Amino acid sequence: MNKDVDYQTFKKSLRKEFKKAVKTILNLQAYNGDLIRDFLALYIPYHVVFYNLSIMKKGSPLRIQTNNLLKEALAKILNFNLAMGPKHIIKIMKKDKADPETMNKLKLVLYIKLFQGVFGHVDKNYNLAFQSFRWCLQFIAYSKRTRLFASIADEQIGAFYELCELFISMLCCHCFLIDLKENEALVGNNLKNFIKRQNPNYSHGFDLNEETKSLQWHWSLDEVDVIEALYCVAFDAMDKITLKFSKVNENFVFSQFFQYCAEIEEMLAILRGKIWECECDVFGPRIGLLVDSNHMNETIQKNILSITFKLKNDPQIICCLNKILEGLLLSSGVQFKVIQFFYVLKLYYMQDNEYTFEASSEMDKLTIECLCIIENIIDACDNPDEVTDYQLPKVLLTAMEGKLLVAEKISEDNDCSESLDDYHPRTYQFRHPRIIIDKMKTKLKQKLRFDSPKDPETDDHWIEYWKYCYQDNIGNLPDILSRIYQTFTDPSN
């Protein structure tokens, strides 16, 4: 969170620039590849600011104009069509003479597919957007592999490729995750049907091994491979990035990058979760999914990083805090005071942010249910200080969109005799992303190689990590945040 620049001021400035770019496109009488590229180069890194504008919607003058311009330009290319795969198109281009005309064809094809993905995302056709963006990434990879630019120096298209590999890979993965969450037949219903064992007919002769095998449906799917491949492209692009941004734009870009990373880690935590059998009752055993602790820790970490890069009054600060609270609850076993701390932090930012309604409207069902449980626990406490030493129970998923199952009662940490196991590790391991961003800002290396000032096993670790990120990215804690921090970390309080 940048203390000098307000998010709304930043957004207004960007939209003013975007309005000029739109006007330029609308005034074109014929296709101009450079102006189309410049428009996309502005839109792609800041799409979260632009995508819901009316000018991007179906039937808008911009949509009509870009479709006409690109269609007319494509009609002049006779040796292929977009129904071909990216690899096949690259092979055809490679046979042509490596001249500016070939390069213009290459750019045109990429721009068409990018607009297809952009408009698919705007229309909430996430499958179309995912397929189009993935096509673009494959197209870029094949063109680089075949060295189509070897004989022609074109720094602009090289920089545009770099921008696409970083931002389109994250946007592509974002669309894939949304489509995955909304696909009840693929995810939600499967998990619910596997878990649902409350029929009395199943209370005898229940084969846990067979149930566990059937529940591990996610191992046989390729969702994890798709997500990790896109994740890898984005991290590799961030490692090699040479793009230059102003300080404010840089902070915005990093905040969005880490927020997308957190979203990816959350889904990996679910897809790589382990099956747990809960205590039997009159209806038979209950089965749930315990999320993967490593990926959930990464989710929390990247949301904290994202918050401290946010601009002042960015409504996404609240979104990230909601996700941190969700992650802490699903991590199973954290001390309640850690959740209390981030809950109070959320209240602090809500008081200072008049745009929090934007964040609340974006919450998914799982986040809403987690927040509801947390608020119920807090409301049930006559004196919250008395429960700060309590360890929260295991919380299992019985459906992708929520429907949580508490697997054990709250117990005091000192009385907890539970043995360590790979399902419920007591030691939090933080594997920071080794993104070397020295080409953008050398000092950012330190942000991504944080060594906790305390042992990771301590209950204050996440609170200390937040403080570290805040001080490193923003500056000294203001008085009110300093008092909040001391309340939850100083034993004398």
UniProtKB/Swiss-Prot annotation:
One of its GO terms (molecular function) is structural molecule activity. It comes from the Eukaryota. Its main location: cytoplasm. GO terms for cellular component: cytoplasm; meiotic spindle pole body. Keywords: Cell cycle, Cell division, Cytoplasm, Cytoskeleton, Meiosis, Sporulation. It is found in: Cytoplasm, Cytoskeleton, Microtubule organizing center, Spindle pole body. One of its GO terms (biological process) is cell division. Interacts with CNM67, SPO21/MPC70 and NUD1. Involved in the pathway that organizes the shaping and sizing of the prospore membrane (PSM) during sporulation. May be required to stabilize the outer plaque of the spindle pole body (SPB). This is Accumulates dyads protein 4. The gene is ADY4.
